[in-house]
Amino acid sequence: MTDLIHDATLDATGLNCPEPVMMLHKHVRELAAGGVLKVIATDPSTRRDIPKFCVFLGHELLGQQEEAGTYLYWIRKKAD
């Protein structure tokens, strides 16, 4: 997958659960409705936690990929 166009980036590299999701929650709150956030993480638990976060809060997971132990996610914030 190529890098999707995004409005903001959250670099959670080196952080472990629950920090990436806590930071994700803060960054999504600050994002405009319909905005896209790119998340960069190294914690494997984000493969489970970030999709569940999106489903639970109604945001759209546009894409995810893994590159040599780095996990990338693109999330579109739901409309207000």
From Swiss-Prot:
Functional note: Sulfur carrier protein which probably makes part of a sulfur-relay system.
Keyword Secreted: no
PANTHER family: SULFUR CARRIER PROTEIN TUSA (PTHR33279:SF2), SULFUR CARRIER PROTEIN YEDF-RELATED (PTHR33279)
GO biological process, one term: tRNA wobble position uridine thiolation
Single GO MF descriptor: sulfur carrier activity
Subcellular location: Cytoplasm
Protein name: Sulfur carrier protein TusA
Pfam families attached to this UniProt entry: TusA (PF01206)
